[in-house]
């Protein structure tokens, strides 16, 4: 079966679709709506994707799905859409709970939004915490219509599709976690599901669907036990479903997070996959769920171990330089970021992946043999950690 | 006369692209060592422009021009290329001297590079100074050959040009100056000159040339007298 090469909506982040900002207040009666945002830029895609304007909400709805997709959780016929939404909402909750537990005080700020025709999302950001410089965990559920050309571009398929707009559904969780301590690593993960409906003039045409996602790890300093721990958890999740997954998705990750102009990777990899649909749908839903559930055990023990280590200004400066590489990758190459910026998504949700600060030092080269050099070498020549 | 709309080589700091080799300057040349060679990514322009690999140099040459472009300083007919190079070298020196005077102590670090077939440049960077967080002042002189498509893209001309690779010359100075104090503004400037030679299979075809450049001002806070001063000059 030919693999999908969806460039539209195959991005690691769905942040572009959660564009309205809403300040969360512990006391709902003191809540005030933010000033309306000035008009978004016109969509400038080669093919335009049609999405309604979002509306802020004061409370989290039980589901962002349209009524026709919403089946009670107890029903054995609950749709993949509904179960995927449940999964990403649960992942958001469990990751945020784990982060707040480590923080010991600071809480996430939450923005909730929805769209009249269905869909919406929740953005949570914790900034300037005790442990985290910046942590963002976003979920979004999007309904839209794309013209046939966008569908062909998204799917990379031959033009055997019937002409007519193609309704689509996309949902995902996306997160970047930047700790303060230079010895604690940055984590990124996202898991997403994409589905097309039959065009209105061709009822009964088969649906297309695929999964995408990944989890990757960006330390400034290598603690081999930490990298091995992280990669072992990814491999365990993969091996439960297919032993070819880890080697395949590990390589895909190393290739995706390549900073071409530097000839180095953003970090030390993890797993990454896109356009997966050549397996049983139930199996892939379980796989994505397993991967999302692996984020906390893969990452939190490492942060707990490193968050209070003593560090010097030199360590902090090196972390800042590596955060500069993170920025370079995200702004120049990351499909999620570039897609969001081009389609008029919510800028704050898109760029929440960037750290609070970063550094670009002219012609900086770590001295060979130092810990900084070891990290750079591992980003230039990806390793097999397990 | 139609204005040039060169998309290639028109970017404000595009000349840095051509001075990509790293070179640490050392106050004592005898302790100087060349850095381990860095693997460089392939050029990935929409149309490929052919440029030789650069070589680090320990001293500034009097000129980066090819001998045939001559540095006849005494001749009243010496070329626009030569005079433009002289101008940008002078601009680099004056700006760096003024910056160092404000700094009182920290000096620019200099990298000099050249290419065997002619061309080269000087990058100067002052980082973590007393006044400047980061100040860069670069000059470069480039000889290369571009395919006709790149030339049409650079010049946005109609396709009346003869097919065949087109030799070009480009020179420029480019600088960005970021002060430490949030009330002191960032400055960017660049001035560049671009010229094409006649293709080898069409000797005598007319040269094309154009200038580009600008100076712009990016404060974090507005002091109206400062902005007026800048725009008045």
UniProtKB/Swiss-Prot annotation, chain A:
Keywords assigned by UniProt, alphabetized: Chlorophyll biosynthesis, Chloroplast, Heme biosynthesis, Oxidoreductase, Plastid, Porphyrin biosynthesis, Transit peptide
Catalytic activity: coproporphyrinogen III + O2 + 2 H(+) = protoporphyrinogen IX + 2 CO2 + 2 H2O
Similarity section: Belongs to the aerobic coproporphyrinogen-III oxidase family.
GO biological process, one term: chlorophyll biosynthetic process
Binding residues annotated for substrate, in chain numbering: 174, 190-192, 344-349
Knockout-associated phenotype: Spontaneous formation of necrotic leaf lesions.
Cellular component annotations (GO), alphabetically ordered: apoplast; chloroplast; chloroplast stroma; extracellular region
Quaternary structure annotation from Swiss-Prot or TrEMBL: Homodimer.
Principal place of residence: plastid
Keyword Plastid: yes
Enzyme class: oxidoreductase
Origin: domain of life: Eukaryota
Site for Important for dimerization, residues: 261
Transit peptide stretch: 1-48
Region of interest: Important for dimerization: 125-134, 326-361
GO molecular-function term, one example from the UniProt record: protein homodimerization activity
Biological role: Key enzyme in heme biosynthesis. Catalyzes the oxidative decarboxylation of propionic acid side chains of rings A and B of coproporphyrinogen III.
InterPro entries, per the entry: Coprogen_oxidase_aer, Coprogen_oxidase_aer_sf, Coprogen_oxidase_CS
Active-site residue numbers: 188
Pathway: Porphyrin-containing compound metabolism; protoporphyrin-IX biosynthesis; protoporphyrinogen-IX from coproporphyrinogen-III (O2 route): step 1/1; Porphyrin-containing compound metabolism; chlorophyll biosynthesis
Location of the protein in the cell: Plastid, Chloroplast; Plastid
Protein name (database record): Coproporphyrinogen-III oxidase 1, chloroplastic
Expression sites (tissue/organ): Expressed in cotyledons, leaves and roots.
Gene3D superfamilies, per database record: Coproporphyrinogen III oxidase, aerobic (3.40.1500.10)
NCBIfam families recorded: PRK05330.1 (NF003727)
Entry's EC annotation: 1.3.3.3
Curated annotation (Swiss-Prot), chain B:
Transit peptide location on this chain: 1-48
The family this protein is said to belong to: Belongs to the aerobic coproporphyrinogen-III oxidase family.
EC code: 1.3.3.3
Swiss-Prot/TrEMBL GO biological process terms: chlorophyll biosynthetic process; protoporphyrinogen IX biosynthetic process
Sorted UniProt keywords: Chlorophyll biosynthesis, Chloroplast, Heme biosynthesis, Oxidoreductase, Plastid, Porphyrin biosynthesis, Transit peptide
Source taxon at top rank: Eukaryota
Primary subcellular site in the record, as a coarse category: plastid
The protein's name: Coproporphyrinogen-III oxidase 2, chloroplastic
Catalytic machinery residues: 188
GO molecular function: coproporphyrinogen oxidase activity
Matching Pfam families: Coprogen_oxidas
Keyword Transmembrane helix set for record: no
Quaternary structure and interacting proteins, as annotated: Homodimer.
Source organism (scientific name): Arabidopsis thaliana
Reactions listed under catalytic activity: coproporphyrinogen III + O2 + 2 H(+) = protoporphyrinogen IX + 2 CO2 + 2 H2O
Job description of the protein: Key enzyme in heme biosynthesis. Catalyzes the oxidative decarboxylation of propionic acid side chains of rings A and B of coproporphyrinogen III.
GO cellular component: chloroplast stroma; cytosol
Organism lineage: Eukaryota, Viridiplantae, Streptophyta, Embryophyta, Tracheophyta
Associated pathway: Porphyrin-containing compound metabolism; protoporphyrin-IX biosynthesis; protoporphyrinogen-IX from coproporphyrinogen-III (O2 route): step 1/1; Porphyrin-containing compound metabolism; chlorophyll biosynthesis
Compartments where located: Plastid, Chloroplast
Residues the record lists as binding substrate: 174
């Amino acid at each position: 079966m030919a693999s999908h090469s969806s460039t539209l909506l195959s991005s690691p982040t769905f942040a572009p679709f959660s564009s309205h900002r809403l300040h969360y207040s512990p006391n709902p009666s003191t809540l005030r709506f933010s000033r309306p945002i000035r008009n978004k830029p016109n969509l400038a895609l080669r093919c335009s994707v049609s999405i309604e304007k979002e509306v802020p909400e004061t409370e989290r709805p039980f589901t962002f799905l349209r009524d026709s997709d919403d089946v009670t959780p107890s029903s054995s016929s609950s749709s993949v859409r509904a179960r995927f939404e449940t999964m990403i909402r649960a992942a958001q909750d469990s990751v945020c709970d784990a982060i707040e537990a480590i923080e010991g005080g600071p809480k996430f700020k939450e923005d909730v939004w929805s769209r009249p025709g269905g869909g919406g999302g929740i953005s949570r950001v914790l900034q300037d915490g005790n442990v985290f410089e910046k942590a963002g965990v976003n979920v979004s559920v999007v309904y839209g219509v794309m013209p046939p050309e966008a569908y062909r571009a998204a799917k990379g398929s031959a033009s055997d599709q019937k002409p007519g707009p193609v309704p689509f559904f996309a949902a995902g969780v996306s997160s970047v976690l930047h700790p303060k301590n230079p010895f604690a690593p940055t984590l990124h993960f996202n898991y997403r599901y994409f589905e097309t409906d039959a065009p209105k003039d061709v009822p009964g045409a088969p649906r297309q669907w695929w999964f995408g996602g990944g989890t990757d790890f960006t330390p400034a300093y290598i603690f081999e036990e930490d990298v091995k721990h992280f990669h072992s958890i990814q491999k365990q999740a993969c091996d439960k479903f297919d032993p070819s997954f880890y080697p395949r998705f590990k390589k895909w990750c190393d290739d995706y997070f390549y900073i071409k102009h530097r000839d180095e990777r953003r970090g030390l990899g993890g797993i990454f996959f896109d356009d997966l649909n050549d397996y049983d749908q139930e199996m892939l839903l379980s796989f994505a769920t397993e991967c999302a559930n692996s984020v906390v055990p893969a990452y939190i023990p490492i942060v707990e171990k490193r968050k209070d280590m003593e560090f010097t200004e030199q360590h902090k400066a090196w972390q800042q330089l590596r955060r500069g590489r993170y920025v370079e990758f995200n702004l120049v190459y990351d499909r999620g970021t570039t897609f969001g910026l081009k389609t008029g998504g919510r800028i704050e949700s898109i760029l929440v992946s960037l750290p609070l600060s970063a550094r670009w030092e002219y012609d900086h080269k770590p001295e060979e043999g130092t810990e900084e050099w070891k990290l750079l070498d591992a980003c230039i020549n990806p390793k097999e950690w397990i | 006369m139609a204005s040039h709309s060169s998309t290639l080589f028109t970017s404000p700091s595009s000349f840095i692209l051509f001075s990509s080799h790293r070179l640490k300057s050392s106050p004592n040349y005898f302790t100087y060592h060349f850095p381990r060679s860095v693997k460089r990514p392939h050029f990935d322009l929409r149309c490929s422009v052919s440029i030789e690999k650069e070589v680090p140099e320990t001293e500034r040459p009097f000129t980066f021009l090819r001998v045939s472009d001559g540095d006849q300083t005494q001749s009243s007919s010496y070329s626009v290329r030569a005079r433009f190079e002289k101008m940008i070298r002078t601009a680099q020196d004056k700006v760096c001297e003024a910056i160092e005077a404000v700094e009182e102590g920290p000096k620019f670090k200099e990298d000099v590079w050249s290419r065997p077939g002619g061309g080269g440049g000087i990058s100067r960077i002052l980082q973590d100074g007393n006044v400047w967080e980061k100040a860069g002042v670069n000059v470069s002189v480039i000889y290369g050959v571009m395919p006709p498509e790149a030339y049409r893209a650079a010049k946005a001309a109609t396709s009346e040009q003869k097919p065949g690779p087109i030799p070009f010359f480009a020179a420029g100075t480019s600088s960005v100056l970021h002060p430490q104090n949030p009330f002191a503004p960032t400055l960017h400037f660049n001035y560049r000159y671009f010229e094409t030679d006649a293709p080898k299979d069409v000797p005598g075809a007319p040269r094309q040339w154009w200038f580009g450049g600008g100076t712009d001002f990016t404060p974090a806070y507005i002091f109206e007298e400062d902005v007026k001063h800048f725009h008045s000059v």
